[in-house]
Every structure is written in structure tokens, then in C-alpha cells.
Swiss-Prot record:
Biased composition (Basic and acidic residues): 90-100, 154-188, 204-213, 221-266
Taxonomic source organism: Homo sapiens
Keyword Secreted belongs to the record: yes
UniProt entry keywords in alphabetical sequence: Secreted, Signal
Reported effect, residue 242 to K: Found in patients with Moyamoya disease; uncertain significance
Protein name, as recorded: Coiled-coil domain-containing glutamate-rich protein 2
CC per GO annotation: extracellular region
Amino acid sequence: MPPRGPASELLLLRLLLLGAATAAPLAPRPSKEELTRCLAEVVTEVLTVGQVQRGPCTALLHKELCGTEPHGCASTEEKGLLLGDFKKQEAGKMRSSQEVRDEEEEEVAERTHKSEVQEQAIRMQGHRQLHQEEDEEEEKEERKRGPMETFEDLWQRHLENGGDLQKRVAEKASDKETAQFQAEEKGVRVLGGDRSLWQGAERGGGERREDLPHHHHHHHQPEAEPRQEKEEASEREEKEVEQLEHLRDELKKVTETLGEQLRREG
């Protein structure tokens, strides 16, 4: 006979007790000591012989089982049916548990998928927002750069014109000094000639003195050229100053326009 486990032996013992005690007469409720003795006897028989012999102990245990269990007095066939129903119920419970676990796993997978999709959507939205902000910043920089480039061009032109003006003024001043120096040299030469003429007049007599005013007038004639050059230089300087003032007004207008645009954008 193949070895049996404790659970299978107890189940077999109960079935054998039920089958053996079917025809046994009922007796008064036994004491705990008697039940313990009968149970030990039946277990010993099962372990040694392999089956339960019909007798007083089997009837006693059968009665006790019928009194404590709802289906204890059912027949062996009914017990088999009950056992099959129990197995079916257990299998149904197992299937239900498996289905519950599957549903839980599906719910977890679905929540995970939704979370991943949501995170991806959030990342994409963040990237789009970042690119949009970068584009807006570039547009602002371009709008700011336009007036600034115009202002820088005007300022550079102002510096270049100012440099040319300073250069021209310096050249004119140098020309003016040169002309003045030449005029002074001419005056010295004229004065020298007058002095020689004066000496000749003294030597030649008093009639020569009448020519002296004529020569003296000739001495003052070369001063007209430096005076004319001074007037022309002064006129040119006034025109250049007017140009600088006009350029300054333009720069002021551009600066005000740029400031208003920056305030509107800021």
C-alpha cells in the first residue's frame, strides 16, 4: 500500500468511520475519556491494518461526528458529492483569485502606461514651451537690435564726421597760422622797405617825404588777405557747427525713440 499523508489518512478515517457506523446502533453521549480511547483505537487500526473495523468505537465516533458537523451523517455517496462540490468551490475560488490578480495586474499596467503617457506629454509640452520662450526672446532681441544698430550707425557716423571736422579745423587752424605768419613776414619786409625809403628820403630831401604815405598805405594792403581767410574759415566753422547740432538732434530723437520702444517691450 502506498504511504499516505496525515491529511489523507484523517479524511480516509472519517469516511471509513461514517461507512462502518451506518448500521451501528446509537448509544448515549460518551465521555471525553471514552472518545479519546476510541479515537486512539481507531487510529491504531488504521495505522496497523490499513482499515477501520466495525465496532463500538466506530459507532461512537460516528455519533459524535453527526452531532458536531452539519453533513456528518450523510452517506458515502453524498460525502463524495459534497467533496466534489467542495473541490469545485475551491477551484472557483482559485479561479476568482487568479482573475482578481490578473485584473489587478492589468490595472497596474494600465495606470503605469497612463502615467508614462502623461509624463511624455508633460515633457513635450515643456519642450514646446521652452522653444516658444526661446523664439520670443530671439524676436525681442532682434527688435531691440534693430534700433540699437541704427543708433550705433548714427553714432559711428557722428564720430567719423566729428573726426573729419576736427581734422579739418586743425588743418584750417594750421593754414590760418601759416597765413598769419606769412602776413607778418610780409609786414616786416614792408616795414624794412619803408625804413630804407625813409632813409633815402632823408638823404634825398624833403620832396621824398610826400611819397611816404603812399608807401605806408602799401604796407597795410597785405593784411586784407588774412582777414578774408579768417572770415571764410569762420563761415565754414559755423556751417560745421550747424551740421553737428543737426546730427546731435537726430541722435537725440533716435535715443528717445529707442527708449520708448524699450519701455513698451519691457
